[in-house]
Every structure is written in structure tokens, then in C-alpha cells.
Curated annotation (Swiss-Prot):
Protein's recorded name: 8-amino-7-oxononanoate synthase
Modified residues (N6-(pyridoxal phosphate)lysine): K238
GO molecular function: 8-amino-7-oxononanoate synthase activity; glycine C-acetyltransferase activity; pyridoxal phosphate binding
Organism: Exiguobacterium sibiricum (strain DSM 17290 / CCUG 55495 / CIP 109462 / JCM 13490 / 255-15)
Positions that bind pyridoxal 5'-phosphate: G107, F108, S179, D204, D205, A206, H207, T235, L236, S237, K238
Family statement drawn from the similarity comment of this UniProt entry: Belongs to the class-II pyridoxal-phosphate-dependent aminotransferase family. BioF subfamily.
Pathway where it operates: Cofactor biosynthesis; biotin biosynthesis
Keyword list, A-Z: Acyltransferase, Biotin biosynthesis, Pyridoxal phosphate, Transferase
Cofactor(s) needed by this chain: pyridoxal 5'-phosphate
Reaction catalysed by this enzyme: 6-carboxyhexanoyl-[ACP] + L-alanine + H(+) = (8S)-8-amino-7-oxononanoate + holo-[ACP] + CO2
Function according to Swiss-Prot or TrEMBL: Catalyzes the decarboxylative condensation of pimeloyl-[acyl-carrier protein] and L-alanine to produce 8-amino-7-oxononanoate (AON), [acyl-carrier protein], and carbon dioxide.
Length: 390
């Protein structure tokens, strides 16, 4: 009927070995999952703390659905705000040590809504070269001038700040934890430079919320920078285990986004089950602190094992550990063979990462046992030798 040129591109992907099928899980998201009837060790989810199937969250979601229904039937600004939506935002602001918080339908929608609403033609956005795709797309939607600085290059960032001093507002945007490499942004130095040149900072804590800081408060709290970062955005779907995105900010910024943030304005609000599960997740993170201990113990054990085997895992200092292969087809071979050995670890290639930087990105969680990780390392050893990667 149309778009026939897409068939050619898809066929080229198949010939290059980079075409991927969606993989359907047949079980809940745990340390082990079922795919095609086979139990696999899960190393590809963002379920850092194991909250996605935590019984407390599941029960709270079920109870909320029974009491308040399956959906809300409206956007927040018309008839879709329940008291629980407002209560959760108050709790989230308290958790993040900010004046206010606003919840969006997803982390991606948060970045689109925040950046497109807050920046105009008189402003400049200064963004790290390896920021998440949602930041890139959010910047594209603004009318602001833009400057991309080299990845975590403070000298290049300072040059960008020096070159843009005539702007009304300058916003420095960085991931807190970079999702493909697992490295942490040098946030103290970024904040110092921003303050030196009278600029603001926005941190995307998608992979830091629930991982860094006290009880998972994120990168800002991790570095003791509470009160010095204008915008903290993040997801509620990774370590927090449910769905949604948020911005933690000052009250007047929240008020403005309620009126001008298009993804917020034109999307139906979260169902009661989602809201209440998110609220319960914050309580679990405050109360079950042993989850963080297990997460970091597992992280160090697995990283050490991969290094000992001789894999290139980059400079990650977080639970994200990339096994960098380079060649896209070889990366997917590694992923496929790992599955044959009982490990679910997906290959990631262009356009998610740059060409020639393909990798199998692994993420350990608080749910993994030592047996899980030892078995996974043995699989990496066998497959790595088969493919002559080690």
C-alpha cells in the first residue's frame, strides 16, 4: 500500500545480521525469566531493586484498581486528577528534597515536555554529547539555541558557557548515569561551572533514581548537591519498577509546566494502580535498605568477574556493565549464544549506540543470587571463547 522503501532497508538489516525480533517474556520480571518455555537469567532489565514484581507493589496496585477502577478517563487538567496523584507528587518532592514535583506519563514524555516548555528563542541549551535520546528529541522541539559539548568534557562545557553569556537562560543538561556506558556524570564540577557562569542545571536521573544517593534519591543527593540543581527528571519505570516520569523542581516551574507542558496537558493521567504502586515503591526504598546493599555487592562481583575473563567493560561504576564488542553482527551473535547458555542479555547496536560501538549491556539487580551471577559468568566465558572475544 505504501512505504515500499522500508522493505529494502529492512532486508538490508536482515542481510547485515542487525534485524531484531521482539522477545516475549512468559513470566514476571525477576532475576530469572521464561522465554519460549526456557528459564533464563535476566541481565537486560532495568529492574535494579527487583520492585517490578515486588509483592507489596503488586498488592497495592491490585487494591487500588479494585477501589478506584482501571483508569481515570481524563487528562489531569480536566477531570483526571485524583487525590492520590497529588499525594504522590508531594511524596516524590519530599523524597527528592525539592519544593515540588510533577509526574508525566513516561520518562521520555518528561524530557519532551520539560525542555520544549521551558526554553525559548532567547535561551541556550548546553547538552552532553551522549545524553539520552529523549533529551535529544526534547531539545529538537525547543526554539532555543543549542550547544553540544563533548562527553563529560568539562573544558568543552566551560567553553560553551563562555560563548553563550548573552542568553536569557542557559540550561546545562546531563544524564546522571549514562545509560549505555554506566558512567556517572561529574556533577559537582558541572554545577560549579554552571554557578560560575550563572547557568542552570538539569539532571536526568533515569538510571540513578533508585540506584544512587540515600535510599535511591539520585545523583544530586549522591554528591550532596541538594538545592543546587534546578531540574531533576527521571523515570518511575526502572529501579522504581512501575511506570511514568517526573520532574522535581520549584513550585513555579511545576505550575508553568501544568499549563505549558504538552505531554502532560494532552495525555490521560496514570491509572490508580500505577499511582499507588509508585507510592508503595518509595516506601519500600526507604524501609528495605538491604536492597541497595545487595545491588552493589552483586554489581562489584559481576564486574570483577567480567574483567577477570578479559572482556572490555569500559569505565562503568554502576550496575550497568557493557560488554563492548564493536561489530554489530558479532554483538548479536554473542547475545543469541548467551541465550542458548541460559542467559538473557540483549545486544545493543546503532542507532542506540554509535556505529562500531555495539555491546551487550548487562544490568545486575538486587534480586540476583550468587549462583545466578556465577552461572552467567560461566556462560560469558564459554561464548566469549567460542567467538574469540577473550
Amino acid at each position: 500500500m505504501g512505504f515500499e522503501h522500508l522493505r529494502t532497508e529492512l532486508e538490508e538489516m536482515k542481510q547485515a545480521g542487525t534485524f531484531r525480533e521482539l522477545v516475549a517474556l512468559e513470566s514476571a520480571q525477576h532475576n530469572r525469566v521464561t522465554v519460549d518455555g526456557k528459564e533464563l537469567i535476566q541481565l537486560s532489565s532495568n529492574n535494579y531493586l527487583g520492585l517490578a514484581a515486588h509483592p507489596r507493589l503488586a498488592k497495592r496496585a491490585a487494591d487500588a484498581a479494585l477501589e478506584f477502577g482501571a483508569g481515570t478517563g481524563s487528562v489531569r487538567t480536566i477531570a483526571g486528577t485524583l487525590e492520590m496523584h497529588q499525594a504522590f507528587e508531594r511524596e516524590l518532592a519530599t523524597f527528592k528534597h525539592t519544593e515540588a514535583a510533577l509526574v508525566f506519563q513516561s520518562g521520555f514524555a518528561t524530557n519532551l515536555g520539560v525542555l520544549s516548555a521551558l526554553l525559548g528563542p532567547e535561551d541556550v541549551v548546553i547538552s552532553d554529547a551522549l545524553n539520552h535520546a529523549s533529551i535529544i528529541d526534547g531539545i529538537r522541539l525547543t526554539k532555543a539555541k543549542r550547544r553540544i559539548y563533548n562527553h563529560v568534557d568539562l573544558a568543552d562545557l566551560e567553553a560553551a558557557l563562555q560563548e553563550t553569556q548573552d542568553a536569557r537562560t542557559r540550561l546545562v543538561v546531563t544524564d546522571g548515569v549514562f545509560s549505555m556506558d554506566g558512567n556517572i556524570a561529574p556533577l559537582p564540577e558541572i554545577v560549579e561551572l554552571a554557578e560560575k557562569y550563572d547557568a542552570l542545571v538539569m539532571v536526568d536521573d533515569a538510571h540513578a533514581s533508585g540506584v544512587l544517593g540515600k535510599s535511591g534519591r539520585g545523583t544530586v543527593n549522591h554528591f550532596g548537591l541538594d538545592g543546587r540543581v534546578a531540574l531533576q527528571v527521571g523515570t518511575l519505570s526502572k529501579a522504581i519498577g512501575v511506570l511514568g516520569g517526573y520532574v522535581a523542581c520549584e513550585q513555579h516551574v511545576k505550575d508553568y509546566l501544568i499549563h505549558k507542558g504538552r505531554p502532560f496537558l494532552f495525555s490521560t493521567s496514570h491509572p490508580p494502580a500505577v499511582v499507588e504502586a509508585n507510592r508503595e515503591a518509595l516506601r519500600v526504598m526507604e524501609e528495605e535498605t538491604e536492597l541497595f546493599d545487595r545491588l552493589w555487592e552483586n554489581t562489584e562481583f559481576f564486574k570483577h568477574g567480567l574483567r577477570e575473563l578479559g572482556f572490555n567493560i569500559g569505565t562503568s561504576t554502576t550496575p550497568i556493565t557493557p560488554v563492548i564488542v564493536g561489530d554489530e553482527a558479532l554483538c548479536h551473535q554473542l547475545s543469541d549464544r548467551l541465550r542458548q547458555h541460559g542467559v538473557f542479555a540483549q545486544g545493543i547496536a546503532f542507532p542506540t549506540v554509535a556505529k562500531g560501538k555495539a555491546r551487550v549491556r548487562t544490568i545486575v539487580t538486587a534480586e540476583h543470587t550468587r549462583e545466578d551471577l556465577e552461572q552467567a559468568l560461566e556462560a560469558f566465558k564459554q561464548v566469549g571463547q567460542e567467538l574469540e572475544l577473550i
